[in-house]
Amino acid sequence: MQAALTAFFMLFFSLLSLLGIAANGFIVLVLGREWLQYGRLLPLDMILISLGVSRFCLQLVGTVYNFYYSAHKVEYSGGLSRQFFHLHWHFLNLATFXFCSWLSVLFCVKXANITHPTFLWLKWRFPGWVPWLLLGSVLISFIITLLLFWVNYPVYQEFLIRKFSGNMTYEWNTRIEMYYLPSLKLVIWSIPCSVFLVSIMLLINSLRRHTWRMQHNGHSLQDPSTQAHTRAXKSLISFLILYVLSFLSLIIDATKFISMQNDFYWPWQTAVYLGVSVHPFILIFSNLKLRSVFWKLLLLARGFWVA
């Protein structure tokens, strides 16, 4: 029974990964084609293509890692492949979290109806900052990944040089890996998460105040401003659920609470990569440009199938 359940979740994880890779690849191809055609992208499209690239690579790396690890448990636990994977995994996760945060900020400054001078200044300046914020996120993610590798290196160096430096050093290295590194990762991941939460709270509060004002004045709730707020809020709420799920899964993964030998490993990996696989479809169907191309391709595929 347990073997059948594991096989089911492995298959489900594989299908989810293929869907995520296809959806993120679709976003990258559509926006990349527009970039090549016109030589420029809107701030929203810059964030979406960056997010699509990072998620595409993250999904690909995660899929290869999980199946390689399941096939080479002993070799992987003490080899260079573990370090190689974690370098890429940490970098892509940090970059993805940062891109998600900038996407939420852009939604907020575009849709929130806030008259504070600081917010109005940010609303005017933020779109021009987007390219530099994306580049800065990549550079900071790269630097933090190298620092994490440098801090974590003593834990693995006995495997790399194939000798131990004594029980005291080994115990100290184990303590670093089990206690200090998860705390450090929690602090690092909390920064983009805080930016995301502040943005979504501001937008939801703006929608609440706008709705109350319209009700108080007796106007229809179907006006364009309210509908724009509602669409953005629905997108961000779904985004928030998937974002929080990804954040919690990273925290649990950092504590090594669920290992490959655990019966819940594959269900947990499905939950870890759920946001990376599902949210691209939300972005596609909430974006007019991506949605129109998607339906055109679907109709084209249907025509070939019928023919």
From Swiss-Prot:
Glycosylated residues in this chain: 167
Membrane-spanning regions, if any?
A: 8-28, 41-61, 89-109, 130-150, 184-204, 235-255, 265-285
Q: Which residues lie on this side of the membrane: Cytoplasmic?
A: 29-40, 110-129, 205-234, 286-307
Function, as annotated: Receptor that may play a role in the perception of bitterness and is gustducin-linked. May play a role in sensing the chemical composition of the gastrointestinal content. The activity of this receptor may stimulate alpha gustducin, mediate PLC-beta-2 activation and lead to the gating of TRPM5.
- Show the Pfam families listed in the entry: TAS2R
The membrane topology term of the UniProt record is: Multi-pass membrane protein
Recorded hits in PANTHER family, A to Z, give: TASTE RECEPTOR TYPE 2, TASTE RECEPTOR TYPE 2 MEMBER 41
Organism annotation: Pongo pygmaeus (Bornean orangutan)
Q: Which UniProt keywords apply?
A: G-protein coupled receptor, Glycoprotein, Membrane, Receptor, Sensory transduction, Taste, Transducer, Transmembrane, Transmembrane helix
CDD domains xref list: 7tm_TAS2R41-like (cd15018)
- Please give the InterPro entries that the UniProt record associates with this protein: TAS2R
Q: Name one GO molecular function term.
A: bitter taste receptor activity
Extracellular topology ranges: 1-7, 62-88, 151-183, 256-264
Which gene codes for it? TAS2R41
Query: What's this protein's name?
Result: Taste receptor type 2 member 41
Q: What else is known?
A: Most taste cells may be activated by a limited number of bitter compounds; individual taste cells can discriminate among bitter stimuli.
One GO CC term on file = plasma membrane
